[in-house]
Amino acid sequence: MPASTAPQAPPAPPAQAQAQAPAQAQEAPAPQRSRGADTRALTQVLFGELKGLAPGTPEHDRVRAALIEANLPLVRYAAARFRSRNEPMEDVVQVGTIGLINAIDRFDPERGVQFPTFAMPTVVGEIKRYFRDNVRTVHVPRRLHELWVQVNSATEDLTTAFGRSPTTAEIAERLRITEEEVLSCIEAGRSYHATSLEAAQEGDGLPGLLDRLGYEDPALDGVEHRDLVRHLLVQLPEREQRILLLRYYSNLTQSQISAELGVSQMHVSRLLARSFQRLRSANRIDA
């Protein structure tokens, strides 16, 4: 009987093939751009298509619907800022989508502004109007209302005396109250109306209080808006640069920034508001 032969191993692949195999395995998942970059690229293409279509036509409606769908993450991002209001998030997203649609209908790609930068103020504005019209105001105790008048007066006097905004401790010492009472007064004013800044402007809030408190400027949300902040930083005084860095890169609240810098939260609010105005002017952000 012929001797049995052991099974032979398959021939080894050529050295070149062996060298290529790891490279091919590494290249299998092609590098993907970030989701945000993909959305911006798709949005740009869709606006290019939309420009050549007559409004009201089926094709125009199809492209417009695709734009809405592609940019819904922007609405959800904006809506998430209002989670503390205890409203159903689905309702807030629906309201924000109305703002998104309005922004799409008004957007002009030739202005050279990124669509998220243009749309965010409209989306957030629509959500704030919803809360203004549908959320009940919070009752502020009379004592806090009266205390605010004293805090406001003391702040003005100390600002004149020191040539700067006073700290919370300095206000408390002037009025012979605790720092906690000063902060309670400020927080009561913040919650007096669901849309703090709008309420004050419309004469609905505590006299002057909410004008002095900070507000979150929608133009600075997201990575695109941080890029705008970075561009603006070189134009700002050193203290405003630091406050913006703490707020939008370190993600500190206004209260935390005031503690970090040893100034009142009202002063932080004013500096942020001043920086926001410069940002809007420099970049022509449509609010």
Swiss-Prot record:
Keyword Hydrolase in record: no
Keywords: DNA-binding, Sigma factor, Transcription, Transcription regulation
DNA-binding region: 254-273
Molecular function terms, GO-annotated: DNA binding; sigma factor activity
UniProt-listed GO biological process terms: DNA-templated transcription initiation; regulation of DNA-templated transcription
Sequence segments annotated as region (Disordered): 1-37
CDD domains named in the record: Sigma70_r4
Biased composition range(s): Low complexity: 15-32
Signal peptide interval: none
Pfam families: Sigma70_r2, Sigma70_r3, Sigma70_r4
Chain span(s) of sequence motif Polymerase core binding: 91-104
Parts forming coiled coils: none
Annotated family: Belongs to the sigma-70 factor family. SigB subfamily.
NCBIfam families in the record: SigBFG, sigma70-ECF
Protein purpose: Sigma factors are initiation factors that promote the attachment of RNA polymerase to specific initiation sites and are then released. This sigma factor is required for normal spore maturation.
Name the UniProt record assigns to this protein: RNA polymerase sigma-F factor
